UniProtKB/Swiss-Prot annotation:
Isoform Mocs1a seems to be translated from a bicistronic transcript while isoform Mocs1b seems to be translated from a monocistronic mRNA that is derived by alternative splicing. This is Molybdenum cofactor biosynthesis protein 1. Residues 3-367 are annotated as: Molybdenum cofactor biosynthesis protein A. Isoform Mocs1a and isoform Mocs1b probably form a complex that catalyzes the conversion of 5'-GTP to cyclic pyranopterin monophosphate (cPMP). Mocs1a catalyzes the cyclization of GTP to (8S)-3',8-cyclo-7,8-dihydroguanosine 5'-triphosphate and Mocs1b catalyzes the subsequent conversion of (8S)-3',8-cyclo-7,8-dihydroguanosine 5'-triphosphate to cPMP. Its EC number is 4.1.99.22, 4.6.1.17. GTP binds at residues 73, 123, 154, 214, 316-318. Keywords: 4Fe-4S, GTP-binding, Iron, Iron-sulfur, Lyase, Metal-binding, Molybdenum cofactor biosynthesis, Nucleotide-binding, S-adenosyl-L-methionine. The gene is Mocs1. It comes from Drosophila melanogaster. The active site is at 525 (for molybdenum cofactor biosynthesis protein c activity). The lineage of its organism: Eukaryota, Metazoa, Ecdysozoa, Arthropoda, Hexapoda. GO terms for molecular function: 4 iron, 4 sulfur cluster binding; cyclic pyranopterin monophosphate synthase activity; GTP 3',8'-cyclase activity; GTP binding; metal ion binding. [4Fe-4S] cluster 1 binds at residues 80, 84, 87. [4Fe-4S] cluster 2 binds at residues 311, 314, 328. In the C-terminal section; belongs to the MoaC family. Binds 2 [4Fe-4S] clusters. Binds 1 [4Fe-4S] cluster coordinated with 3 cysteines and an exchangeable S-adenosyl-L-methionine and 1 [4Fe-4S] cluster coordinated with 3 cysteines and the GTP-derived substrate.
Length: 565
């Protein structure tokens, strides 16, 4: 039971404490509600019959935004038989010890558990899944799961001519093939291996066997953008779905956005040659925007994870080769089901509870925490991002950001067309000062003077200079700035609250936040001669009104001890 609690604590992440694992009762993990993920707006979902709504709501595979996850991607291996230069060095990469990876029995057990909880589609990925000797057996055993509707595989296609017929007999339903070029020489240069002919032969064999394979192509500027129309032409006589995937422009420590070719740019290139290139209907959980040239046997799709995310309808979970569950491809949080499964004291019911707890931690969208870069990137950096389990980066989502244009360049928002309204914003910050400083502030004995009054004045001045401190922030004519400093003796802290008002075309939340931040820094500056164990915390917006989207946070429950107005 202690191990199960440790698993849950690890899942909660560094920002939460062990105290948030409220209890373990009858094998069920109950997590305390924490501000920040239970107060977010619920994403829209497709209407269901009432009884199905109840089942989905109570399912461990339904997250806090109502998204029910029916699609599981399982990475069978970290190994690959290609050496694509954007994935790994020519000599390969260090692999995890075998005992750290899931065994075949563990993979099949987890697949069964997920299917019993509501997964209806499984895709086997890697690395390269066909390097496993037991790939056919795994497909056959998963296909035998009574409630599983589809099983697919994503592969580089090198050995399809040898394996596809046995895989079809085992029950393989669908097939994705990764191919970034239709030119033999370019293929050998990028993959450092021969085999382009075998991949094309594998695609043609798949068509002959009745499949409609999906061909995944990562578009990169100055690499294969000259082949965009060639890939569309590839669909003329073949019933295949070519899917252009936007390049995730991360390399080493830097974003290289110059290599990104956006969906709209690609669409424009295609329509220059085929003006009647038209959109097709999409399913509710499709990641690809479907298009086709009239009369062609195949179609084209666009996976726009960089410029237009599809988080609102995401129904996918990922299981890594070493047994971690990932609820988001772009997230850095992973949670080991392997460790829990190998602990004999953890029951299957408890394992399901852990899966449910992981799903509940899924965010509304992968860009909601801003485009952050994480330090521990898996060596297989891009092409297998759609079937590699441990890519850890946050996507830049330019189309959703107001202060950058479509190419990621900085721009100031034009508010000229907005109506002029009365705008109001409130923000707060807390400065933990400790017992000694609390008494000195209360007695007005701090050597630099009246801490609360000076902090109040500094906050007002800070609000008025916000446009000089925050890039691209509008210079606003403020009608009122009020900063309140409160000494909380019991908490040994100073609470700062700012209320800012204006009549204008843009809001004043940044002015309110700047006011409390500058006031908090002033408290630190005036008190640092006494102690450096001062902590500025809880800087946050309390409310804003008068704009397109009002906001109201629940009021803090702090007792007022000393007040300066």
């Amino acid at each position: 039971m202690r191990l199960l609690a440790r698993h849950a604590i690890r899942l909660l992440g560094q920002e939460n404490s062990a105290g948030e694992v409220a209890s373990l009762s009858r094998g069920a993990i109950r997590l305390k509600a924490t501000t920040g993920y239970l107060n977010l707006a619920t994403a829209s979902v497709q209407p269901l019959e009432p009884e199905k709504q109840v089942l989905r709501k109570n399912s461990p595979l339904t997250d806090s935004f109502g998204r029910h996850h029916t699609y599981l991607r399982i990475s069978l291996t970290e190994r690959c038989n290609l050496r694509c230069d954007y994935c790994m060095p020519a000599e390969g990469v260090p692999l995890q010890p075998k005992n750290k990876l899931l065994t075949t029995e563990e993979i099949l057990r987890l697949a069964r558990i997920f299917v019993e909880q509501g997964v209806r589609k499984i895709r086997l990925t890697g690395g390269e899944p066909t390097v496993r000797r037991d790939i056919v057996e795994i497909v056959a055993q998963m296909k035998a799961l009574p409630e599983l509707e589809q099983i697919g595989i994503t592969t580089n296609g090198l050995v399809l001519t040898r394996l596809l017929l046995p895989l079809q007999r085992a029950g393989l339903d669908n097939l994705n093939i990764s191919l970034d070029t239709l030119k033999r020489d370019r293929f050998e240069k990028i993959t450092r291996r021969k085999g382009w002919e075998r991949v094309i032969a594998g695609i043609d064999l798949a068509v002959q066997l009745g499949y409609r394979p999906k061909v995944n192509c990562v578009l990169m500027r100055d690499f294969n953008e000259d082949e965009i129309c060639d890939f569309v032409e590839f669909t003329r006589n073949r019933p295949v779905d070519v899917r252009f995937i936007e390049y995730m422009p991360f390399s080493g420590n830097k974003w290289h956005t110059e290599r990104l070719i956006s969906y709209k740019d690609t669409l424009q290139i295609i329509r220059q040659r085929w003006p009647d290139f038209k959109a097709l209907p999409n399913g509710p959980n499709d990641t690809s925007k479907a298009y086709a040239v009239p009369g062609f046997k195949g179609q084209v799709g666009f996976i726009t994870s960089m410029t237009e995310h599809f988080c609102g309808t995401c129904n996918r979970l990922r299981l890594t080769a070493d047994g971690n569950i990932k609820v988001c491809l772009f997230g850095n949080k992973e949670f080991s089901l392997r460790d829990a499964m190998r602990d004999e004291s953890v029951s299957e019911e408890q394992l399901v509870d852990l899966i449910g707890a992981a799903v509940q931690r899924k965010k509304k969208q992968h860009a909601d925490a801003a485009p952050r870069l994480h330090h521990h990137l898996h060596p297989y950096s891009y092409h297998h991002a759609y079937h590699t389990s441990r890519l850890q980066l946050q996507a830049r989502n330019y189309s959703q950001l107001t202060h950058v244009d479509g190419q990621g360049k900085a721009q100031m928002v034009d508010v000229g067309a907005k109506p002029s309204t009365t705008r109001l914003a409130r923000a707060e910050a807390t400065v933990q000062v400790g017992e000694k400083l609390t008494q000195l502030i209360a007695d007005n004995q701090v050597a630099k003077g009246d801490v609360l009054t000076v902090a109040q004045i500094a906050g007002i001045m800070g609000a008025k200079r916000t446009a000089e401190l925050i890039p691209l922030c509008h210079n606003i004519s403020l009608s009122s700035v009020k900063v309140q400093a409160t000494l909380l003796k019991t908490e040994q802290s100073v609470r700062l609250e700012a209320t800012v008002r204006c009549s204008g075309q843009t809001g004043v939340e940044m002015e309110a936040l700047t006011a409390v931040s500058v006031a908090a820094l002033t408290v630190y500056d005036m008190c640092k001669a006494v102690s450096h164990d001062i902590c500025i915390t809880n800087v946050r917006l309390l409310s804003k009104s008068g704009g397109k989207r009002d906001f109201q946070r629940e009021e803090p429950q702090n007792g007022i001890v000393t007040e300066v107005e």
